[in-house]
Amino acid sequence: MTVETFKPKQTTTLDIPVKTLEAASTNAVTTGNRIGFVSLGCPKNLVDSERILTQLRIDGYEVTNSYDNADLVIVNTCGFIDAAVEESLDAVREALEENGKVIVTGCLGAKENQIREVHPDVLEITGPHSYEAVLKHVHKYVPKPEHNPFTSLIPQTGVKLTPKHYAYLKISEGCDNRCTFCIIPSLRGDLDSRPAGSILDEAKRLVESGVQEILVVSQDTSAYGKDKGGRTDFWNGMPVKQDITSLARQLGKMGAWVRLHYIYPYPWVDDLIPLMAEGLILPYLDIPMQHASPRILKMMKRPGRVDRQLEAIQRWREICPDLVIRSTFIVGFPGETEEDFQILLDFLKEARLDRVGCFKYSEVDGAVANTIAELISEDVKEDRYHRFMEVQAEISAERLARFVGRTLDILIDDVDEEGAIGRSFADAPEIDGMVFINGETELEPGMLVRARITHSDEHDLWAEVVDADTQD
């Protein structure tokens, strides 16, 4: 089941935009108890939105895509960087102006005073993953329908804000690291891993519902299970170790693509690479490295042995030659010198990463990094950002060119009058590139097709469909 949420009028400034769907559920019952919903932020926040929406539907509420038709509006906010805070406050403002009855939840909700200073008329405010509190507040202002005969129509997977063929699977909350640029632990707490059996149950339901790609997310995915003290959980009567490698191995047996996001560079990440080489999980590693200067990494409270990171990348590629590595970096961190920045550029040239995102340092309210060194001017940050992206564009083009002439499985995301648009194992939805298959207008979203790569640039691939039995 998909539910239509609506998109605020302001332009999004985040990598993951305001989530909006094209088609509303056709079996939603008209109850007069209508809730509007705005979901902002990252995929982890998206999962929180899906859980709230699922419970709203179970409770008999109708989710509407119009401010005018809503009895109340929920805004699930992001509060990680200043731009996200501004966007969230703008979304709350718009909801108040257009509707008047607003409940705020999500990461920014952990800073109630900040919201109240700008928007004192908000009805209620809760922090992140406060599902029960959100529902309690909804019941207070919009009475729960006495009976809804259609709740049995809600699938076991619940409400999803993603296309039917892929879904995010959140395996834990919080983080035990204390990176100086990040305030996530203060918003979402320390690491709290879900039981392995619960995760695998959810994954099984997703696959049985037609999901072809599971995107594993959390604040610190590779730390999964560290808080469990080595305790074993059970699934289908079998013991399952609660660590990321054991979990990934079980997920890989379910017959869907499994893509891992937000991998912190712990030593045991090495154990995941053989699973990728075996084809159990996608050979794709999203591992935010943040910088390469040992001095800056120390100030960030991040792992600082860049030589070991380069050795690891080489080792991983030897084990799994198809491995695609995505990473993110920060330029303009407080105290960053030109020498530090050159070390970062040199690292890029040596590491030859496949996909890279770059962020200009933003002063996050409450982040330790704001006060540990002199702030970098906006002009310098902008200059370094463009120099960084120029270097990486050439590297990305080189890395993508290796696929030309190969035949790959392509998961179709969209089809228009020009053809189909999909992704290979090398491309995560919404953040990486795409594969364009011109002329194939008969394909449908969710199809997995074989296609030969004919062309590439620094971001995307172009391909043509071939017979299913065609090999590389």
Curated annotation (Swiss-Prot):
Q: Which Gene3D superfamilies match?
A: Methylthiotransferase, N-terminal domain, Nucleic acid-binding proteins, tm_1862 like domain
State the reactions this protein catalyses: L-aspartate(89)-[ribosomal protein uS12]-hydrogen + (sulfur carrier)-SH + AH2 + 2 S-adenosyl-L-methionine = 3-methylsulfanyl-L-aspartate(89)-[ribosomal protein uS12]-hydrogen + (sulfur carrier)-H + 5'-deoxyadenosine + L-methionine + A + S-adenosyl-L-homocysteine + 2 H(+)
Example GO biological process term? tRNA modification
Q: Name one GO cellular component term.
A: cytosol
What region holds the TRAM domain? 401-467
Q: How is the cofactor bound?
A: Binds 2 [4Fe-4S] clusters. One cluster is coordinated with 3 cysteines and an exchangeable S-adenosyl-L-methionine.
Residue ranges annotated for the MTTase N-terminal domain, each copy included: 33-143
Described purpose of this protein according to its UniProt entry:
Catalyzes the methylthiolation of an aspartic acid residue of ribosomal protein uS12.
Q: What name is this protein filed under?
A: Ribosomal protein uS12 methylthiotransferase RimO
Q: What is the lineage of its organism?
A: Bacteria, Pseudomonadati, Pseudomonadota, Gammaproteobacteria, Alteromonadales
